[in-house]
Protein backbone atom coordinates (compact mmCIF):
# COMPACT_ATOMS: atom_id res chain seq x y z
CA UNK A 1 0.00 0.00 0.00
CA UNK A 2 1.38 3.42 -0.99
CA UNK A 3 2.30 5.88 1.78
CA UNK A 4 0.14 8.94 2.32
CA UNK A 5 2.63 11.73 2.98
CA UNK A 6 2.05 15.15 4.54
CA UNK A 7 3.02 16.73 1.21
CA UNK A 8 0.26 14.78 -0.57
CA UNK A 9 -2.31 15.82 2.02
CA UNK A 10 -1.20 19.45 1.67
CA UNK A 11 -1.48 19.33 -2.12
CA UNK A 12 -4.95 17.79 -1.98
CA UNK A 13 -6.08 20.45 0.49
CA UNK A 14 -4.82 23.20 -1.80
CA UNK A 15 -6.53 21.69 -4.84
CA UNK A 16 -9.91 20.95 -3.22
CA UNK A 17 -10.19 23.30 -0.25
CA UNK A 18 -11.32 20.35 1.91
CA UNK A 19 -10.22 19.76 5.51
CA UNK A 20 -7.02 17.95 6.46
CA UNK A 21 -8.69 14.83 7.89
CA UNK A 22 -11.03 14.60 4.91
CA UNK A 23 -8.07 14.82 2.51
CA UNK A 24 -6.10 12.20 4.42
CA UNK A 25 -9.08 9.84 4.42
CA UNK A 26 -9.59 10.34 0.67
CA UNK A 27 -5.91 9.61 -0.04
CA UNK A 28 -5.91 6.46 2.09
CA UNK A 29 -9.00 5.19 0.26
CA UNK A 30 -7.38 6.03 -3.10
CA UNK A 31 -4.08 4.34 -2.13
CA UNK A 32 -2.25 7.71 -2.29
CA UNK A 33 -3.43 8.40 -5.86
CA UNK A 34 -4.20 12.11 -5.69
CA UNK A 35 -6.13 12.24 -8.98
CA UNK A 36 -8.34 9.34 -7.89
CA UNK A 37 -8.82 10.99 -4.49
CA UNK A 38 -9.98 14.21 -6.18
CA UNK A 39 -12.33 12.26 -8.44
CA UNK A 40 -13.82 10.42 -5.46
CA UNK A 41 -14.20 13.66 -3.50
CA UNK A 42 -15.96 15.30 -6.43
CA UNK A 43 -18.35 12.34 -6.65
CA UNK A 44 -19.13 12.49 -2.93
CA UNK A 45 -19.53 16.26 -3.01
CA UNK A 46 -16.74 16.83 -0.48
CA UNK A 47 -14.65 19.02 -2.79
CA UNK A 48 -17.67 21.07 -3.85
CA UNK A 49 -18.77 21.50 -0.23
CA UNK A 50 -15.32 22.70 0.78
CA UNK A 51 -15.31 25.35 -1.94
CA UNK A 52 -18.75 26.51 -0.83
CA UNK A 53 -17.57 26.76 2.80
CA UNK A 54 -16.04 30.18 2.14
CA UNK A 55 -19.41 31.61 1.12
CA UNK A 56 -21.26 33.63 3.76
CA UNK A 57 -24.31 31.76 5.06
CA UNK A 58 -26.46 34.45 6.69
CA UNK A 59 -29.96 33.25 5.73
CA UNK A 60 -31.62 30.13 7.09
CA UNK A 61 -34.13 29.10 9.72
CA UNK A 62 -34.74 28.80 13.44
CA UNK A 63 -36.25 25.42 14.29
CA UNK A 64 -37.84 24.59 17.66
CA UNK A 65 -38.61 21.18 19.10
CA UNK A 66 -39.94 20.31 22.57
CA UNK A 67 -39.59 16.96 24.31
CA UNK A 68 -39.92 15.88 27.95
CA UNK A 69 -39.87 19.37 29.42
CA UNK A 70 -36.97 20.59 27.28
CA UNK A 71 -37.08 22.77 24.18
CA UNK A 72 -34.24 23.05 21.68
CA UNK A 73 -33.83 26.12 19.49
CA UNK A 74 -31.56 25.52 16.52
CA UNK A 75 -30.20 27.91 13.91
CA UNK A 76 -29.20 26.40 10.57
CA UNK A 77 -27.84 28.79 7.95
CA UNK A 78 -27.74 28.86 4.17
CA UNK A 79 -26.91 31.60 1.68
CA UNK A 80 -30.31 32.53 0.25
CA UNK A 81 -33.88 32.84 1.47
CA UNK A 82 -34.93 30.59 -1.44
CA UNK A 83 -32.91 27.65 -0.07
CA UNK A 84 -34.17 28.34 3.47
CA UNK A 85 -37.61 27.28 2.20
CA UNK A 86 -36.30 24.25 0.26
CA UNK A 87 -37.72 20.92 1.50
CA UNK A 88 -34.27 19.30 1.57
CA UNK A 89 -32.93 22.11 3.77
CA UNK A 90 -35.90 22.04 6.16
CA UNK A 91 -35.75 18.23 6.42
CA UNK A 92 -32.06 18.48 7.35
CA UNK A 93 -32.79 21.13 10.00
CA UNK A 94 -35.64 19.03 11.46
CA UNK A 95 -33.37 15.98 11.65
CA UNK A 96 -30.69 17.95 13.48
CA UNK A 97 -33.08 19.55 15.99
CA UNK A 98 -34.64 16.15 16.75
CA UNK A 99 -31.19 14.81 17.63
CA UNK A 100 -30.46 17.96 19.64
CA UNK A 101 -33.51 17.80 21.90
CA UNK A 102 -33.11 14.05 22.42
CA UNK A 103 -29.53 14.33 23.71
CA UNK A 104 -29.08 18.05 24.50
CA UNK A 105 -25.89 17.90 22.46
CA UNK A 106 -23.58 20.88 22.01
CA UNK A 107 -23.41 22.59 18.63
CA UNK A 108 -19.94 21.09 18.11
CA UNK A 109 -21.32 17.60 18.72
CA UNK A 110 -24.17 18.21 16.28
CA UNK A 111 -21.78 19.57 13.66
CA UNK A 112 -19.62 16.44 13.95
CA UNK A 113 -22.62 14.08 13.93
CA UNK A 114 -24.18 15.60 10.80
CA UNK A 115 -21.07 16.60 8.84
CA UNK A 116 -21.43 13.92 6.15
CA UNK A 117 -25.12 14.73 5.71
CA UNK A 118 -24.31 18.44 5.51
CA UNK A 119 -21.62 17.89 2.87
CA UNK A 120 -24.03 15.84 0.76
CA UNK A 121 -26.69 18.56 1.11
CA UNK A 122 -24.23 21.29 0.05
CA UNK A 123 -23.38 19.25 -3.05
CA UNK A 124 -27.07 18.76 -3.84
CA UNK A 125 -28.28 22.32 -3.20
CA UNK A 126 -25.18 24.22 -4.27
CA UNK A 127 -25.01 26.55 -1.27
CA UNK A 128 -23.01 26.62 1.93
CA UNK A 129 -24.99 25.14 4.83
CA UNK A 130 -24.00 25.64 8.46
CA UNK A 131 -25.30 24.35 11.80
CA UNK A 132 -24.60 27.58 13.66
CA UNK A 133 -25.95 27.36 17.21
CA UNK A 134 -28.31 25.55 19.55
CA UNK A 135 -29.80 26.60 22.89
CA UNK A 136 -31.99 24.75 25.36
CA UNK A 137 -34.76 25.84 27.72
CA UNK A 138 -36.12 23.55 30.43
CA UNK A 139 -39.27 23.99 32.50
CA UNK A 140 -42.57 22.48 33.58
CA UNK A 141 -44.44 24.97 31.39
CA UNK A 142 -42.93 25.98 28.04
CA UNK A 143 -44.36 28.16 25.30
CA UNK A 144 -42.78 28.54 21.88
CA UNK A 145 -43.36 30.96 19.02
CA UNK A 146 -41.85 31.24 15.55
CA UNK A 147 -42.18 34.36 13.45
CA UNK A 148 -41.83 32.88 9.98
CA UNK A 149 -38.56 30.99 9.67
CA UNK A 150 -36.43 33.85 10.97
CA UNK A 151 -37.23 34.27 14.67
CA UNK A 152 -37.77 31.62 17.32
CA UNK A 153 -38.66 32.10 21.00
CA UNK A 154 -39.19 29.73 23.91
CA UNK A 155 -40.45 30.97 27.28
CA UNK A 156 -40.29 28.94 30.50
CA UNK A 157 -42.47 29.82 33.47
CA UNK A 158 -45.74 29.19 35.22
CA UNK A 159 -49.22 30.02 33.94
CA UNK A 160 -51.78 29.14 31.32
CA UNK A 161 -50.64 28.26 27.81
CA UNK A 162 -52.26 31.29 26.15
CA UNK A 163 -50.58 33.81 28.47
CA UNK A 164 -47.14 32.26 28.02
CA UNK A 165 -47.67 32.12 24.24
CA UNK A 166 -48.49 35.84 24.21
CA UNK A 167 -45.35 36.52 26.24
CA UNK A 168 -43.32 34.54 23.70
CA UNK A 169 -44.82 36.68 20.93
CA UNK A 170 -43.87 39.80 22.90
CA UNK A 171 -40.27 38.56 23.23
CA UNK A 172 -40.11 37.98 19.48
CA UNK A 173 -41.22 41.55 18.77
CA UNK A 174 -39.54 43.51 21.58
CA UNK A 175 -36.17 41.73 21.95
CA UNK A 176 -35.69 41.94 25.74
CA UNK A 177 -32.24 40.90 26.93
CA UNK A 178 -33.09 39.93 30.54
CA UNK A 179 -36.13 38.65 32.44
CA UNK A 180 -36.28 41.34 35.17
CA UNK A 181 -34.71 44.80 35.63
CA UNK A 182 -32.77 43.38 38.59
CA UNK A 183 -31.16 40.81 36.26
CA UNK A 184 -29.28 43.47 34.28
CA UNK A 185 -25.58 42.97 35.22
CA UNK A 186 -23.91 45.72 37.27
CA UNK A 187 -21.22 46.32 34.63
CA UNK A 188 -23.89 46.89 31.96
CA UNK A 189 -25.70 49.34 34.25
CA UNK A 190 -22.47 51.22 35.08
CA UNK A 191 -21.49 51.48 31.43
CA UNK A 192 -24.88 52.92 30.49
CA UNK A 193 -24.81 55.23 33.52
CA UNK A 194 -21.45 56.69 32.41
CA UNK A 195 -22.87 57.32 28.93
CA UNK A 196 -25.99 59.03 30.34
CA UNK A 197 -23.96 61.23 32.73
CA UNK A 198 -21.80 62.37 29.84
CA UNK A 199 -24.88 63.13 27.73
CA UNK A 200 -26.39 65.21 30.57
CA UNK A 201 -23.12 67.10 31.11
CA UNK A 202 -22.87 67.79 27.37
CA UNK A 203 -26.31 69.37 27.70
CA UNK A 204 -24.73 71.86 30.12
CA UNK A 205 -25.75 70.24 33.43
CA UNK A 206 -23.26 70.26 36.35
CA UNK A 207 -21.99 66.77 37.28
CA UNK A 208 -23.96 66.57 40.56
CA UNK A 209 -27.23 67.42 38.82
CA UNK A 210 -26.35 65.16 35.89
CA UNK A 211 -25.85 62.19 38.23
CA UNK A 212 -29.22 62.83 39.91
CA UNK A 213 -30.95 63.08 36.52
CA UNK A 214 -29.40 59.79 35.47
CA UNK A 215 -31.09 57.85 38.31
CA UNK A 216 -34.42 58.18 36.50
CA UNK A 217 -32.86 57.40 33.15
CA UNK A 218 -31.26 54.23 34.52
CA UNK A 219 -34.60 52.97 35.82
CA UNK A 220 -35.99 53.52 32.34
CA UNK A 221 -32.98 51.77 30.77
CA UNK A 222 -33.20 48.60 32.92
CA UNK A 223 -36.94 48.50 32.24
CA UNK A 224 -36.48 48.77 28.48
CA UNK A 225 -33.95 45.93 28.25
CA UNK A 226 -35.84 43.54 30.56
CA UNK A 227 -38.96 41.55 29.73
CA UNK A 228 -41.03 42.37 32.81
CA UNK A 229 -40.14 46.07 32.62
CA UNK A 230 -41.26 46.52 29.02
CA UNK A 231 -44.66 47.78 27.88
CA UNK A 232 -46.69 44.75 26.77
CA UNK A 233 -47.17 44.81 22.98
CA UNK A 234 -50.84 43.77 23.21
CA UNK A 235 -51.67 46.28 25.98
CA UNK A 236 -49.03 49.05 25.81
CA UNK A 237 -50.40 50.91 28.84
CA UNK A 238 -49.38 47.98 31.04
CA UNK A 239 -45.97 46.42 31.64
CA UNK A 240 -45.36 42.72 31.11
CA UNK A 241 -44.95 42.43 34.90
CA UNK A 242 -48.47 43.82 35.39
CA UNK A 243 -49.92 41.43 32.80
CA UNK A 244 -48.22 38.45 34.42
CA UNK A 245 -49.55 39.46 37.84
CA UNK A 246 -53.10 39.82 36.48
CA UNK A 247 -52.91 36.37 34.90
CA UNK A 248 -51.26 34.69 37.89
CA UNK A 249 -48.31 33.78 35.70
CA UNK A 250 -44.53 34.15 35.87
CA UNK A 251 -41.50 33.80 33.61
CA UNK A 252 -38.27 32.19 34.80
CA UNK A 253 -36.33 32.15 31.55
CA UNK A 254 -36.55 32.75 27.81
CA UNK A 255 -34.42 32.35 24.71
CA UNK A 256 -34.83 34.35 21.51
CA UNK A 257 -32.87 33.49 18.37
CA UNK A 258 -32.94 35.37 15.10
CA UNK A 259 -31.39 34.12 11.87
CA UNK A 260 -28.10 35.77 10.98
CA UNK A 261 -27.58 37.70 14.24
CA UNK A 262 -23.94 38.80 14.31
CA UNK A 263 -23.13 37.49 10.83
CA UNK A 264 -21.66 40.09 8.52
CA UNK A 265 -23.23 39.68 5.10
CA UNK A 266 -21.13 40.20 2.01
CA UNK A 267 -22.02 43.28 -0.02
CA UNK A 268 -24.22 42.43 -2.99
CA UNK A 269 -22.34 42.37 -6.28
CA UNK A 270 -23.49 44.88 -8.87
CA UNK A 271 -24.43 43.70 -12.35
CA UNK A 272 -21.27 45.31 -13.79
CA UNK A 273 -19.08 43.52 -11.22
CA UNK A 274 -20.88 40.26 -11.96
CA UNK A 275 -20.15 40.61 -15.69
CA UNK A 276 -16.51 41.46 -14.95
CA UNK A 277 -16.20 38.40 -12.71
CA UNK A 278 -17.62 36.15 -15.42
CA UNK A 279 -15.20 37.60 -18.00
CA UNK A 280 -12.26 36.93 -15.68
CA UNK A 281 -13.43 33.35 -15.74
Swiss-Prot record:
It comes from the Bacteria. The keyword tRNA-binding does not apply. One of its GO terms (cellular component) is cytoplasm. SUPFAM superfamilies: Elongation factor Ts (EF-Ts), dimerisation domain (SSF54713), UBA-like (SSF46934). Keywords: Cytoplasm, Elongation factor, Protein biosynthesis. Residues 80-83 are annotated as: Involved in Mg(2+) ion dislocation from EF-Tu. One of its GO terms (molecular function) is translation elongation factor activity. It is found in: Cytoplasm. InterPro entries: EF-Ts_dimer_sf, Transl_elong_EFTs/EF1B, Transl_elong_EFTs/EF1B_dimer, Transl_elong_Ts_CS, UBA-like_sf. It holds the Pfam family EF_TS. Its main location: cytoplasm. PROSITE patterns: EF_TS_1, EF_TS_2. Associates with the EF-Tu.GDP complex and induces the exchange of GDP to GTP. It remains bound to the aminoacyl-tRNA.EF-Tu.GTP complex up to the GTP hydrolysis stage on the ribosome. Belongs to the EF-Ts family. This is Elongation factor Ts.
Amino acid sequence: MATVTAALVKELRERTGAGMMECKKALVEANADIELAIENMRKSGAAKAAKKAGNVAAEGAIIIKEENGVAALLEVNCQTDFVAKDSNFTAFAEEVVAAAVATQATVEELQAQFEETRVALVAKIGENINIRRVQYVAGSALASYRHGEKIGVVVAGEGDAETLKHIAMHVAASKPEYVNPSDVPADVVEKEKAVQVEIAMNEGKPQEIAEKMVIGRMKKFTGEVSLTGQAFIMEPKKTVAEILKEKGASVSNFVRLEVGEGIEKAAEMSFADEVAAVQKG
